[in-house]
């Protein structure tokens, strides 16, 4: 299953002046849940509204051949935190929490901490690995605190948004902005009212998620750290 994965870097990163001034850039990693490339404007969806994600793509660059090796939430996140295949670690079954030797397979934030980074994770960990609490590798495993991040530079901060989770297609059509009958369906879905309703609700969910991305970027800008921060956006599997 293809997943959305797009990096946005400092545009002038190659310049000698900037490279000497920012030896270790901050890293803001924005993640969302379940949406794949078909639900984002910068990947060709002309109907969905994702101006903030599209803006990141226009300013930086995006990947077009990136795939989730374990396309379920927690197994996919186990590959993020270790850089290893889920089948290698035995974490591919959902909620398996297979124990791995952490002295041999460190978490990504462990490596960043070892070179002086302050590492934070905005509430959700869910890395599907046993033998160690997911929160133990973070300096701050709860909500993002921009003031603290500025005091602790350089930082690596994960911010996770739930709005695009597939469960947002459930429930009644209440306060839905997109019109179900105008929704463009994929060819592999039957054209029935229930599918159109799900599409309309999910378009709205992705739009709300994109607003949260915009809020995070605005907070980063207001903190005064945007010019020394690499921003990464990805969904967890799609």
Positions of the model-derived regions?
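Sec-dependent N-terminal signal peptides
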Residues: 4-13
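Formylglycine-dependent sulfatase
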Residues: 2, 18-238
């Amino acid at each position: 299953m293809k997943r959305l994965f797009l990096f946005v870097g400092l545009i002038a990163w190659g310049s000698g002046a900037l490279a000497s001034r920012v030896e270790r850039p901050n890293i803001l990693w924005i993640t969302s849940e379940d949406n794949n490339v078909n639900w984002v404007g910068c990947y060709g969806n002309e109907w969905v509204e994702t101006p903030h994600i599209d803006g990141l793509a226009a300013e930086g660059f995006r990947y077009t051949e990136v795939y989730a090796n374990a396309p379920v939430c927690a197994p996919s996140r186990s590959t993020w935190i270790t850089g290893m295949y889920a089948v290698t670690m035995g974490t591919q079954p959902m909620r398996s929490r297979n124990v791995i030797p952490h002295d041999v397979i460190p978490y990504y934030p462990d490596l960043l901490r070892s070179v002086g980074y302050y590492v934070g994770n905005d509430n959700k960990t869910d890395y599907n690995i046993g033998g160690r609490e997911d929160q133990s590798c973070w300096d701050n495993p709860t909500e993002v605190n921009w003031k603290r991040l500025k005091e602790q530079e350089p930082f690596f901060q994960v911010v996770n948004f739930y709005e695009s989770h597939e469960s947002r297609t459930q429930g009644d059509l209440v306060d839905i902005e997109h019109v179900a009958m105008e929704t463009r369906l994929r060819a592999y879905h039957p054209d029935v009212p229930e599918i159109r309703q799900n599409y309309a609700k999910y378009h709205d969910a992705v739009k709300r998620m994109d607003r949260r991305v915009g809020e995070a970027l605005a907070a980063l800008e207001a903190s005064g750290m945007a010019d020394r921060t690499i921003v990464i956006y990805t969904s967890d599997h799609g």
